[in-house]
Each structure stands twice: as C-alpha cells, then as structure tokens.
Regions:
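Hydrophobic alpha-helical transmembrane segments of multipass integral membrane proteins
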Residues: 26, 30, 34-54, 197, ...
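Hydrophobic alpha-helical elements at and bordering transmembrane segments
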Residues: 25-29, 33, 63-71, 110, ...
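Loop-to-helix entry region at the N-terminal start of transmembrane alpha-helices
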Residues: 27-36, 85-106, 144, 190-195
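Cytoplasmic-entry segments and transmembrane alpha-helices of multi-pass inner-membrane transporters
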Residues: 49-85, 98, 108-115, 122-123
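Transmembrane alpha-helices
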Residues: 96, 100, 132-166, 189, ...
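Hydrophobic alpha-helical transmembrane segments of polytopic membrane proteins
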Residues: 175-209
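Short cytoplasmic-facing helical segments at TM-TM junctions of multi-pass membrane proteins
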Residues: 106-154, 175, 179
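Periplasmic/extracellular loop-to-transmembrane helix junction in inner-membrane transport proteins
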Residues: 1-42
Length: 209
C-alpha cells in the first residue's frame, strides 16, 4: 500500500486534529451520537412493548410473529428509499432507520424469552394469589431479564450499523457522512479516523449497558 492508501497513525491523528480545530469533529460526533441515542431509545421501547405483547399473548404471536420475522431479514439499505419517500431526507428518516435497527434485536430476544418461561412457575405464582403486574414482576420479568440485557446490547450494536447506512445517504454531518466525504475526496486519513471514531463510539455506548 502507498502512503495515500494506508496513511500512518500520525497522519490520521493530524487529520483528527485539523477537524477538531475547525470544530467539525465535535459536530460529527455529537450529531451521530444524538441519532444513535434517540433511534436506539425509540426502537428499544417499541421492541420491549411489542416483544412482551407477543411473548405473553399467544394469539398475537400467531398473528404477528411471522410478519415481523420476515421484516427482520430486510437489509438496512433496503429501507432507505422507502423512508426517503415517506419521511423525506431530513433528520426523522435517519432516526427512524436507526430505530428500525434497534427494534428487532430487542423484540426477538424479549418475545422468545417470555414465550419460553416455564408455565409451572407461573401457575405456582397464581396459586399464591399473584395476578397482573405483580405476577409479571415476580416470575416472567426476572426470568427474562438477562435476555433483555443481551437484546439491548445487540440493539445498540445494530443501531450503530444502521446509523452508518442512514448517514451514507442524504446526510451533511455525522460520522457516516465523514466516511463518504473522505472517500469522495481521497482522504484516506480522514476515512480511517471516521472508522476509529465509530469503533470508539460503539465501545463507549456498549459499556453503558
């Protein structure tokens, strides 16, 4: 590889310093972080609610689970044209795409975990007079909590992947945009910087869960 194709760490650091001095680096980081946090929050809440509904209620599982399972297989970039037509090229479409990415891991883990809670434990709790919310927090919730945490961590990683897909198309700021702009201008140093920052951002957000 030439120095242009594979710049030294010194050049990558220099590129980051240059962007930081111009105020662009902080802007890219803040915007991408906002999109990940907002999209992840929306997707995770929807995944928890729908996953709990389908995991606990048999008719909902029979009616909706196959369709949701099929939608889960759709690649991230396939959603982009539809979201652009429905929502436009603004911020909402990017956050929505990130939310889609975060939704499926949470939904899948929660619904599967609740569906496999031992019915004997539930019946035993009912025999002791537990009903409604008290029953849910006593038996199913503790049983699925490890799966929920795993689902949230997977969702956060998936949100990062969908963030890049969202920012590669129709964005003027963010780490995904920095990737595309660096490629178009032959700035491999900035491109590698963006990759490193995405890795650091992913690691930091993963440490929160």
């Amino acid at each position: 590889f030439t120095a242009v194709q594979l710049p030294s760490p010194t050049r990558v650091i220099a590129a980051g310093t240059e962007l930081a001095q111009r105020g662009e680096l902080a802007t890219h980081l803040v915007i991408s972080t906002q999109r990940v946090v907002l999209g992840f929050s929306i997707g995770a809440v929807l995944g928890l609610v729908l996953g709990a509904l389908i995991g606990l209620w048999g008719p909902a599982r029979i009616a909706a689970a196959p369709t949701i399972g099929a939608l889960r297989a759709v690649p991230s970039l396939a959603w982009v044209p539809l979201l652009l037509l429905w929502i436009g090229i603004g911020e909402n479409s990017k956050v929505t795409l990130v939310a889609i990415g975060a939704f499926f891991p949470v939904y899948t883990t929660v619904s599967a975990a609740l569906a496999h809670v031992d019915p004997k434990l539930v019946e035993a709790a009912r025999a002791f007079g537990y009903r409604g919310v008290k029953l849910f927090t006593t038996v199913p919730l503790p049983a699925v909590l490890p799966s929920v945490v795993s689902g949230l961590r997977l969702a956060l990683a998936q949100a990062g992947l969908f963030l890049v897909a969202a920012e590669l198309l129709g964005a003027s700021m963010g780490l995904g945009y920095l990737l595309t702009d660096s490629q178009n201008n032959g700035r491999t140093d900035r491109l590698l910087l963006a990759i490193v920052l995405l890795a650091v951002l992913g690691k930091l957000t993963d440490a929160l869960i």
